[in-house]
């Protein structure tokens, strides 16, 4: 075994390890087939190569893995990647091996014999990159081997899991600094996450004990994603319509409960769609089998709870539909971000109903207590979860640009209108709602600030509901004063007043409307209010589609996909690990004739060119004659 001298692997002098003769761009091209770095990747790579810790906050699909994989191939030593995601480890290791990189993973999916084999190979220095589940880091056998190895870097994926205020807190992440401290010398550390508020970012830096880290935020925008919120009367009918419009496309349908997953999956299967399911109630073998069916394109649609998808690197997901509203914006954006990872246009559609809010309130209030938190801390977590749910609800009811709402939530800036969301493409007009707001606020005040949205709407619209009448609410002066106002419009105005601080909705399961101090100016006529309200005729909100290929190239693309599928099946790997759809489309456009031209295709590296070039060039040649 090779024992690196202390002077070489010392943290302060870690840059000595860098193979400076190898240009990072040549590594990027040779192994990953890319000619240039994306936004942020260059700075992060330079920082890690120079021995400075990094906190990288980059949206899903922005190429976080490149940020540590390129330096890993330039360091003399080994890189340890900490990841909580078994499926992602498997896919990324497969992709690295396909690209000519010696890599392995250690997690609970390995048999004891496989685990011992990986340890043996690790000890003999056979791997350049090792993915490890956080629970396995401090295992005596693994830690004992690592103490004697030249470990150049530790990369922490899904770093928000270290924070108890994050949406995926995992106590095992708190052990990562102990693992690093137990090594003979401190490696450079990179922490990466797709979604992190300011509080979570501070936690990551503190709890992972990052040393003067370079913080790189590339922006949260995913320009190729089209965001849409719908409030259908019948979700199942609307879902079938959406799926039929996307026939043969790969997509994910997220549901909030196991029961909903079963019902939606059965609905899709009965209507002839190749759908499968994933939730925590299934045994591990079935979950793995169903996940593989989706990853290997045997099933085109995955219906799942949020237990699925955080570690799925499937590049050709063209739509994500949320059948139910998630609990918070962090979860929503991460799950929606599974779409369009290949850079092609994709749809992110949320089907909203008020029932979703109540379901999530129930889940928050009845969540399993965390034994690592005190009761006061647990209550604070619930309070923050309720606040995040409120923001998620505002997203579903807002009339402003959905992309702008998302970006502002994460502290980023966006245009007033993106023209690539359902709100921007819907037919709304800027409407004076001052009088309507006064009527609503007056009703809330005159009924004693004791009722929720439904009752207030019923009073204002003059409902003949017996319970309302028996409660004496029909005798209120505000009873029926908005009888001509459609219920949806009335609810939209109430949501707008709550979202902008003129009223509050207090309580969890059945929120009560109350006036906020800000309402005084409106009630006294000193302030006017306007909002974007939908007018009857509405443009169809449809995502921008990728420019179509010529008919001849469409046939070539189909042939290339068939070849890719055949090659993938022979190796028992997902098709997108061979080449992504975006790479196949680039082949159709460039139509390379030689190995030299083939390697110029985006996404084709040296190893893949040698492994697959002759097969793909032969098919391209057939269509070029």
At which residue positions do the language-model features occur?
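Accessory DNA-binding and partner-docking regions appended to nucleic-acid-acting proteins
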Residues: 8-24, 358-359, 370-375, 384-386, ...
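Short helix-to-turn junction characteristic of helix-turn-helix DNA-binding domains
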Residues: 48, 243, 294, 396, ...
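Flexible coil/turn residues that form the inter-helical turn or adjacent wing/linker of helix-turn-helix
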Residues: 185, 247, 399, 449, ...
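Helicase motor core with emphasis on the C-terminal RecA-like subdomain
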Residues: 7, 14-31, 35, 39, ...
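Short, charged low-complexity linear segments at domain edges
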Residues: 380-410
């Amino acid at each position: 075994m090779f024992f690196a001298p202390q002077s070489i692997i010392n943290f302060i002098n870690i840059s000595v390890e860098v193979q400076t003769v190898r240009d990072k761009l040549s590594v990027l091209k040779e192994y990953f087939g890319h000619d240039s770095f994306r936004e942020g990747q260059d700075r992060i790579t330079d920082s890690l190569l120079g021995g400075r810790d990094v906190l990288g906050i980059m949206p899903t699909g922005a190429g976080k893995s490149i940020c540590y994989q390129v330096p890993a191939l330039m360091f003399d030593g080994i890189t340890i990647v900490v990841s909580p995601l078994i499926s992602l480890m498997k896919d990324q290791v497969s992709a690295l091996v396909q690209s000519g990189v010696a890599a392995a993973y250690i997690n609970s999916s390995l048999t004891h014999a496989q685990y011992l084999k990986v340890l043996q190979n690790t000890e003999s220095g056979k791997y350049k990159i090792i993915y490890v589940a956080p629970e396995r880091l401090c295992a005596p056998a693994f830690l004992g081997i690592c103490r004697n190895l030249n470990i150049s870097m530790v990369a922490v994926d899904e770093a928000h899991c270290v924070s108890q205020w994050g949406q995926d807190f995992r106590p095992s992440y708190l052990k990562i600094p102990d693992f690093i401290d137990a090594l003979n010398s401190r490696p450079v550390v990179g922490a990466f996450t797709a979604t992190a508020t300011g509080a979570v970012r501070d936690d990551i830096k503190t709890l992972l004990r990052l040393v003067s880290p370079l913080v790189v935020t590339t922006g949260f925008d995913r320009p190729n994603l089209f965001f849409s919120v719908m409030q259908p009367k019948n979700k199942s009918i609307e879902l079938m319509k959406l799926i039929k419009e996307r026939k043969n496309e790969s997509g994910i349908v997220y549901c909030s409960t196991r029961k909903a997953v079963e019902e939606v999956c059965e609905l899709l299967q009965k209507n002839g769609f190749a759908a499968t399911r994933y939730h925590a109630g299934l045994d591990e073998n079935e979950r793995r089998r169903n996940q593989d069916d989706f990853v290997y394109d045997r099933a085109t649609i995955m219906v799942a709870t949020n237990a699925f998808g955080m570690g799925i690197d499937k590049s050709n997901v063209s739509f994500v539909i949320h059948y139910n509203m998630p609990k918070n914006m962090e979860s929503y954006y991460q799950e929606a971000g599974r779409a369009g990872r290949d850079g092609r246009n994709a749809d992110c559609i949320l089907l909203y109903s008020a029932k979703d809010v109540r379901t999530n309130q129930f889940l928050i209030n009845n969540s399993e207590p965390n034994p690592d938190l005190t009761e006061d801390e647990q209550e604070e977590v619930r309070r923050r979860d309720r606040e995040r749910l409120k923001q998620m609800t505002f997203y579903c009811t807002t009339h402003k640009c959905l992309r702008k709402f998302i970006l502002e939530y994460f502290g980023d800036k966006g245009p007033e209108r993106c023209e690539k969301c359902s709100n921007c493409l819907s037919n709304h007009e800027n409407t004076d709602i001052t009088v309507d707001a006064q009527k609503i606020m007056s009703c809330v005040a005159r009924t004693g600030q004791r009722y929720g949205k439904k009752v207030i709407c019923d009073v204002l619209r003059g409902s003949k509901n017996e319970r309302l009448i028996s409660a004496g609410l029909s005798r209120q002066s505000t009873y029926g004063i908005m009888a001509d106002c459609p219920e949806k419009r009335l609810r939209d105005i109430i949501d707008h007043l709550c979202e902008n601080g003129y009223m509050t909705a207090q309580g969890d399961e059945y929120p009560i409307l109350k006036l906020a101090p800000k309402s005084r100016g409106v009630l006294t006529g000193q302030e006017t209010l306007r909002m974007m309200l939908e007018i009857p005729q509405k443009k169809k909100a449809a995502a921008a589609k990728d420019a179509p290929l010529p008919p001849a190239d469409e046939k070539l693309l189909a042939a290339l996909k068939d070849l890719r599928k055949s090659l993938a099946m022979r190796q028992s790997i997902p098709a997108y690990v061979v080449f992504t759809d975006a790479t196949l489309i680039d082949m159709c456009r460039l139509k390379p004739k030689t190995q030299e031209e083939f390697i110029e295709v985006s996404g084709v590296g040296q190893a893949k060119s040698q492994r697959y070039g002759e097969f793909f060039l032969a098919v391209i040649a057939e269509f070029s004659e």
